[in-house]
């Protein structure tokens, strides 16, 4: 949808004609004095349906090249195209909470349209003097994240993993925990993912009672590349309103940032640009930067972002995930080998990292325990090849103890999720950071060496492990 301020003023609108349609790319010719600006939204009536085009290039001779935000089937040469003199706009205001929109800010939840102020989706990043750096830790209630990969309010977290290792369910759990524990507002941008997942997410939010704290924006994988490329900006514009106008701390979830890059690659090819490395667009870094630089903390409030990053063929050196890395404060890497052991969330604590795992930010004890956990898991990984060839019996007593504790730590990093209750039958748990640190300290100090490793799987805190063991022992 476009701004009412512009659509109502006929005298400011210029009319062009469709002269060429190439898939999602539409060329439009205007008169000499009325050529639209880059990123202006144009409207064409396509068999009774409003189709929005976004200007991407001025190719000379009064012709602009545009990308369609919807299907172009049925579009004919010679059709009238109206220039709105405004970019695509997104709805803003508290009224958007509990609602679901498409890339144009039109409701897709079968509820009435909203009569609210709209903001253009293309904006400059906040100026340097408006920025603020905060080091306030955001407690997620997920043990492996709070202990090993803590992140701050206003930080950016990347969620890396291949297909089917649990990225989306981890995002759902974070939304659930933040809404319930911090009374926070979330904006979820579904970028180029499955429609079924969006539908499931919407109904799960209703069941969990967190929909009224969330706004959902979707551009699914069946939609044209223009919609998939711009939907992240629509979600970000809505989040910016809560930060800048309401002085709130907002959570922006993007699932999946790779699809943003992928859509940009498709658009780039359609526009005739020469591809860069591995076939990606030559403007990859610029496009990513223009999105990521707007996701930041200002003196008004903060936008904390969690971005799921699909890693093609599990290759972290691929240009799409590699470009995303440069903007992140923390990265959570999900590993298929951990998922295959039945341990969820399948976070790899050794491949994951956070710049805020620092004694001055999280405290000395937390930092020391996290470091000891990393060392134990690294030693276990180093010993695995020996165990595979010679077996556990060939290890020294000291190494056997390291392996036993590391396996308990590995199992204890698993956790039951609220959003997974109906699939697993296990009730979800929110674990406080202090309980997490205390529990892992007990394992590392050898206080629970007598308890077999199976008791640590899907236990919330160390007290639960001891209680379960004692209950079975008394039988």
UniProtKB/Swiss-Prot annotation:
Pfam family, one: ATP-synt_VA_C
Keywords: ATP synthesis, ATP-binding, Cell membrane, CF(1), Hydrogen ion transport, Ion transport, Membrane, Nucleotide-binding, Translocase, Transport
Its membrane topology: Peripheral membrane protein
Catalysed reactions, semicolon-separated: ATP + H2O + 4 H(+)(in) = ADP + phosphate + 5 H(+)(out)
SMART domains: AAA
PROSITE patterns linked: ATPASE_ALPHA_BETA
Main location: membrane
Gene Ontology terms, MF aspect: ATP binding; ATP hydrolysis activity; proton-transporting ATP synthase activity, rotational mechanism
Entry EC no(s): 7.1.2.2
Family the UniProt entry places it in: Belongs to the ATPase alpha/beta chains family.
Subunit structure: F-type ATPases have 2 components, CF(1) - the catalytic core - and CF(0) - the membrane proton channel. CF(1) has five subunits: alpha(3), beta(3), gamma(1), delta(1), epsilon(1). CF(0) has three main subunits: a(1), b(2) and c(9-12). The alpha and beta chains form an alternating ring which encloses part of the gamma chain. CF(1) is attached to CF(0) by a central stalk formed by the gamma and epsilon chains, while a peripheral stalk is formed by the delta and b chains.
Function noted in UniProt: Produces ATP from ADP in the presence of a proton gradient across the membrane. The catalytic sites are hosted primarily by the beta subunits.
HAMAP family cross-referenced by the UniProt entry: ATP_synth_beta_bact
Protein name, as recorded: ATP synthase subunit beta
Organism name: Mycoplasma mycoides subsp. mycoides SC (strain CCUG 32753 / NCTC 10114 / PG1)
Phylogenetic lineage: Bacteria, Bacillati, Mycoplasmatota, Mollicutes, Mycoplasmataceae
GN (gene name): atpD
